[in-house]
Amino acid sequence: GQGGTVATLHKFIPGSTSLWDFSLEQLSNHRVGYENLCATAAEVGKLTAEMHQALIDTDSSSAFAPIAPTVPESEASANAMVDHAQNVWNTAKAAELSPPLRHRIDQMLSHHVSINDALRTAVTSVQTAAYIRVHGDYHLGQILITPESRRIEVIDFEGEPQKTLAERRRKTSVYKDLASMSRSFDYLCFQAHRTGAAQHSASQLVRIFLEAYAVGSGGACFYPDNEKERMALLNGYMLDKAIYELGYEVHYRPDWIDVPLRALERYLHSGSLLKT
């Protein structure tokens, strides 16, 4: 029969805290805190590359063997993204919101067809990079940092809790993790500013993170070998993540709707979720 995991044993890391909490505290220190956080973003990029390297096995019979994405797999991913997006659009359309938010949501919803098309195009475009097992629920709260040494470690590899085990195990583009972490930096800067810190650029943190990841992953089978493919996947998966966030915030945290909504508005204005 098929084997399974009964229990796992994890290392205890004394004195550690989540990188989310640590980063919020850093940003309260204004300029110095942001400079330190830029350095940390580079470390997160390096760590993420190491994580993805650890999640592959060159043995073709292994459950962690990389696979070449096929057209049916890409189309299935695109269909799942578009179906999910349509559910979010329906939820947002029916939500009871303040008049200013209602107006912004309606403006965004008037472009939902073009957003759906962009999702499909990004994921079904020609891909040279292999699909692998990924973290699946990757954000700043999933990284522990020991403040004294600045050592960082990834935790919680269970994947998205609302998905089935088979879905969590499904191999996909590493840009699922990269987009999720990139969006986490946007949330971080929003929350820091809301609690009194200066306005900081999430896009700069994302660029530093991605540049460090590129250095650590250059030549890896899961990393695209051309800029066009990299940007298409980044935009596609960030768009998918922002849509997920919008649905979540409409349901559970209306005070946070502005974060994903601003990202989607930015995309409609410039074709990118990152500020230029």
What are these regions (language model features)?
Residues 88-133:
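An alpha-helical support segment within catalytic cores of ATP-dependent transferases
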Residues 78-85, 108-116, 206, 264:
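Short amphipathic alpha-helical coiled-coil/interface segments
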Residues 64-82, 105, 224-238, 263-267, ...:
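Charge-rich, acidic-biased intrinsically disordered regions
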Residues 199-200, 204-222, 232-276:
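ATP/Mg2+ or Mg2+-diphosphate-binding catalytic cores
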Residues 137:
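Conserved catalytic-loop position in the HRD/HxD motif
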Residues 1-91, 148-209, 214-220, 226-227:
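Conserved ATP-binding subdomain of kinase catalytic cores across diverse folds
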